[in-house]
UniProtKB/Swiss-Prot annotation:
Broad EC category: hydrolase
Record remark on domains: A Gly-cisPro motif from one monomer fits into the active site of the other monomer to allow specific chiral rejection of L-amino acids.
Protein's job: An aminoacyl-tRNA editing enzyme that deacylates mischarged D-aminoacyl-tRNAs. Also deacylates mischarged glycyl-tRNA(Ala), protecting cells against glycine mischarging by AlaRS. Acts via tRNA-based rather than protein-based catalysis; rejects L-amino acids rather than detecting D-amino acids in the active site. By recycling D-aminoacyl-tRNA to D-amino acids and free tRNA molecules, this enzyme counteracts the toxicity associated with the formation of D-aminoacyl-tRNA entities in vivo and helps enforce protein L-homochirality.
Localisation per UniProt entry: Cytoplasm
Main location: cytoplasm
Disulfide bonds: none
Source taxon at top rank: Bacteria
Protein name as annotated: D-aminoacyl-tRNA deacylase
GO molecular-function terms, A-Z: D-tyrosyl-tRNA(Tyr) deacylase activity; Gly-tRNA(Ala) deacylase activity; Ser(Gly)-tRNA(Ala) hydrolase activity; tRNA binding
Gene Ontology CC, one term: cytoplasm
GO terms for biological process, alphabetical: D-amino acid catabolic process
Record motif Gly-cisPro motif, important for rejection of L-amino acids, residues: 138-139
Reactions mediated catalytically: glycyl-tRNA(Ala) + H2O = tRNA(Ala) + glycine + H(+); a D-aminoacyl-tRNA + H2O = a tRNA + a D-alpha-amino acid + H(+)
């Protein structure tokens, strides 16, 4: 499971001209589910994102999480983060999970982030052609990569 996490002052997702998800201060998470991802990756990614300390405290040090600041998280599925570029110039997406299972894990991820960690979650629309708008705060961008299970 891979995630590109961006600290934002605002972010939104538009599908066919309609805003389907939006947040104010918080995080934008672009999430890719890979073949072999399971419960271990799901739980760890939920914890990592909810507890990632990338917001400034009163001294200006990155020491607070999105939970600490009572921020929001916009989660957008993005299978292209699973691109394999080891050969040639055209990306291979063979590492990405098949859509039906990927969608189930994506929705489970969003639900757990909200229910288990108490974070307000907005979502993109899985599998849709989306326009993502954001104001990156900092900018702060963090790459999280949790390898799939063996076998």
């Amino acid at each position: 499971m891979r995630a590109l996490v961006q600290r934002v002052s605002e972010a939104s997702v538009v599908v066919e001209g309609q805003v389907v998800g939006a947040v104010e201060r918080g995080l934008l998470v672009l999430l890719a589910v890979e073949r072999g991802d399971g419960e271990k990756q799901l739980e760890e990614m939920v914890r990592k994102v909810a507890r990632l300390r990338i917001f400034p405290d009163e001294a200006g040090k990155m020491n607070l999480s999105v939970k600490d600041i009572e921020g929001e998280v916009l989660v957008v599925s993005q299978f292209t983060l699973a691109a394999d570029m080891r050969k040639g110039y055209r990306p291979s997406f063979s590492l990405a999970e098949e859509p039906k299972r990927a969608e189930a894990l994506y929705l489970d991820y969003c639900q757990r982030l909200n229910q288990h960690e108490g974070v307000v979650v907005a979502q993109g629309l899985f599998g849709a052609d989306m326009q993502v708008k954001l104001i990156n705060d900092g900018p702060v961008t963090i790459w999280l990569d949790l390898p799939p299970q063996e076998g």
